[in-house]
Design a protein with these regions (language model features):
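Intrinsically disordered, metal-sensing/regulatory segments
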Residues: 1-259
Length: 259
């Protein structure tokens, strides 16, 4: 149980440490740095979706033979559509954009920026929760080391995300303390989502392949809809692509080495 608690809190710690950058850094992150950090986060999320979620989902459905892809296929698409729905139902504003997404709202600009990151963090919390639920259920395809690898990978990419949200909030006029707090709060949905998922472990076990791929679909939606456009903004540069490759490689190595 202790390793499960640690696994849930590690990604949240990554967000909190990243948000703490606003307490020590005087200047806003440059576009170049933000592009690199966003590309890195995207790479980690894609690798985690493949090695930690989609592959285990298909392995657990191996008894279906040539149709083992069906649970992963179905869960993946439900995850995509779920995030698409949230994207249209929740008013939010990405840090490097002036165009509000979702329904019209009178919410403050800073509030909608926090909502954008919170929306992004929902699938990550679900991914951690589903993996640890599978571990607690004794599923052979999910090991403690593999679950830890996912938690560490998400924590690594949460660090730059924490900075990317807290620094713009500071630039919008919030105090350092408030910008830090909002950065931390944007990541609170991760442990909450993970705990809620684990609490339903008994109901989840039969549907684990679907839920693993659901989390993967939700994460990849965020990557394609949000992160890839953000890392490609401004003057053309290969920096975002290279940072993506670094993040992908690190997460792949973590999962294979620890899994």
């Amino acid at each position: 149980m202790r390793q499960t608690v640690y696994g849930i809190l590690i990604p949240f710690l990554g967000t909190s440490l990243g948000a703490a950058c606003v307490l020590f850094m005087r200047r806003q992150l440059s576009d170049t740095v933000q592009r690199a950090l966003t590309g890195f986060a995207a790479g980690v999320m894609v690798a985690a979706s493949v090695w930690s979620l989609l592959i285990p989902a298909m392995e657990q459905a191996a008894w279906m033979g040539k149709l083992a892809f069906l649970p992963a296929f179905a869960g993946f698409w439900v995850g995509i559509l779920f995030l698409l729905a949230l994207d249209h139902l929740i008013p939010h504003l990405h840090a490097r954009s002036n165009q509000t997404e979702g329904p019209k709202s009178r919410l403050q600009r800073t509030t909608m920026m926090v909502l954008a990151v919170t929306l992004h963090n929902i699938p990550e919390g679900m991914a951690v929760g589903v993996v640890y639920a599978g571990l607690l259920s004794g599923t052979a395809q999910i090991t403690a080391a593999g679950a830890l690898a996912l938690s560490l990978g998400i924590a690594i990419q949460n660090f730059p995300e924490g900075a990317i949200i807290s620094m713009p909030l500071r630039a919008e006029g919030e105090s350092k303390g408030r910008a830090f707090l909002n950065g931390v709060l944007s990541g609170i949905v991760e442990p909450i989502g993970a705990v809620l998922t684990i609490l339903g472990t008994r109901l989840i076990v039969p549907a684990l392949p679907y839920l693993l791929s659901f989390a993967a679909g939700a994460m990849l939606y965020v990557v394609v809809e949000e992160l890839i456009p953000e890392m490609s903004q401004g003057k053309h540069s290969n920096l975002g692509a290279l940072a993506f490759a670094v993040g992908f490689s690190i997460m792949m190595a973590l999962d294979v080495a620890l899994g």
